[in-house]
């Protein structure tokens, strides 16, 4: 239904779209974890965020937590937002890597750089169970926030179906 909705959005009027699906194959209908690019797709279709969250029983997510990914008992949180803030001369990660090297060489205290995830607002907010929508101004730390959704995928499919059928 994503393809049908996208085609319905850009196709000339009176274009006939045929979608082939089998009623014999049931919908799994579990919660679906998305990534931030789905927001761009929904914007393209003109689907408002509040409508999506209401109709699909959705919530926000700030990243993906990979539990037991590397090995049992280990986890890795992949945030959607950006790390720190770049300067005109350097990317943030280059500055952090330099501080880390200085700490390893004993030039500064070993714990001075901290861990890189401490410099990612999405990671810190997720650990604390907090969320605030991003702000457009680059002057605020909230401008580094990126997010996605977790919602009922069956409901999202129904929403896209209605969208495509209304335009076809």
Predicted regions and their residues:
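Glycine-rich FAD pyrophosphate-binding loop
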Residues: 6-30
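Short beta-strand to alpha-helix junction loop
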Residues: 143-162
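A conserved beta-strand/loop element that lines the FAD pocket in flavoprotein oxidoreductases
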Residues: 164-168
């Amino acid at each position: 239904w994503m393809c049908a909705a996208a085609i319905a959005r850009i196709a000339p009027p009176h274009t006939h779209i045929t979608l082939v699906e089998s009623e014999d194959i049931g919908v799994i209908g579990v919660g679906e974890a998305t990534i931030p690019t789905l927001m761009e797709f929904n914007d393209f279709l003109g689907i408002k965020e509040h409508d999506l969250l209401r109709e699909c029983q959705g919530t926000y997510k700030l990243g993906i937590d990979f539990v037991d990914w590397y090995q049992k008992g280990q986890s890795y949180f992949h945030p959607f937002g950006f790390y720190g803030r770049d300067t005109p001369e350097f990317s943030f990660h280059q500055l952090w890597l330099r501080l880390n090297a200085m700490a390893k060489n004993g030039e500064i205290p070993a714990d001075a750089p901290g861990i890189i995830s401490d410099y990612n607002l999405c990671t810190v907010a997720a650990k604390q169970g907090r969320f605030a929508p991003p702000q457009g101004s680059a002057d605020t730390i909230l401008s580094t926030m990126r997010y996605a959704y977790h919602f009922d995928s069956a409901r999202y499919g129904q929403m896209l179906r209605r969208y495509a059928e209304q335009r076809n």
